[in-house]
């Protein structure tokens, strides 16, 4: 769970300090800087970015990113619509509900968090229910409105388009895509370049950690 991940992060930071790993924060590295370092190996672990699909009415002005919400960079209104019922959407919905927000979670697939392991999934769904999150599945968003969405039930191709509105905030959690701004460019002057974690393929934290450990033992 989140508590285990939090403890793991603390452990990894402590180990880095123990072995003298230089850590630089709040700095966006450039190709020029990397070239000047003349490294033998570069590991690209730049993560993923929020996926913004081509849906009418969707723009950066009327939706919030899950990461900004979870990190406290933005504050939502009382009534919140979370679009996307994957792990990030479900976790965001839970987070907001625990802050006494009135949350609705909408998902196109017939089930929520379909890729989550069978042990963690029931617990997360139970948390959503206990936190009184309204969950709407089989709902394909047709258009984003200033205060909601229109959607159609995927089980009925010719069914009516319904409106879900009256929200103060909308959080977009419809997926992530790999973010690797210069992995290919690095190969021009670095002999060994490895892309791992979400930068390779958006997934779960334990998968990224496994890739990192596996790579570290082979370099």
Question: What positions do the PLM features span?
Answer:
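A Rossmann-like FAD-binding core segment of flavoenzymes
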Residues: 6-51, 58-78, 98-185
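Short acidic, glycine/serine/threonine-rich loops at helix termini
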Residues: 55-56, 206
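N-terminal Rossmann-like FAD-binding beta1-loop-alpha1 element of flavoenzymes
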Residues: 87-99
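Glycine-rich Rossmann-fold phosphate-binding loop(s) that bind the pyrophosphate
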Residues: 84-86, 175
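A conserved FAD-binding loop/helix module that cradles the flavin
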Residues: 89-92, 111-123, 181, 187-190, ...
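Short glycine-enriched, charge-decorated loop/helix-capping segments at active-site entrances
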Residues: 1-3
């Amino acid at each position: 769970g989140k508590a285990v991940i939090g403890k793991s992060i603390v452990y990894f930071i402590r180990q880095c300090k123990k072995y003298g790993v230089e850590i630089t924060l709040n700095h966006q590295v450039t190709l020029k800087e990397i070239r000047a370092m003349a490294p033998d190996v570069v590991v690209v672990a730049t993560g993923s970015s929020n996926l913004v699909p081509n849906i009418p009415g969707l723009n950066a002005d009327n939706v919030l990113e899950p990461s900004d919400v979870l990190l406290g960079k933005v504050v939502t209104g009382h009534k919140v619509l979370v679009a996307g019922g994957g792990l990030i959407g479900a976790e965001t919905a839970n987070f907001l509900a625990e802050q006494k927000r009135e949350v609705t979670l909408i998902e196109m697939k017939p089930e929520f968090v379909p890729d989550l392991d069978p042990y963690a999934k029931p617990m997360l769904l139970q948390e959503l229910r206990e936190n009184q999150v309204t969950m709407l599945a089989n709902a394909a968003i047709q258009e984003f409105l200033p205060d909601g969405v229109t959607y159609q039930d995927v089980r009925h191709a010719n069914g009516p388009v319904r409106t879900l509105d009256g929200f103060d905030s909308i959080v977009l959690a419809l997926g992530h895509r790999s973010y690797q701004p210069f992995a290919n460019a690095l190969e021009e002057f670095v002999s060994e370049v490895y892309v791992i974690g979400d930068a390779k393929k958006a997934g779960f934290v334990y998968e990224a950690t496994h890739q990192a450990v596996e790579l570290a033992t082979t370099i």
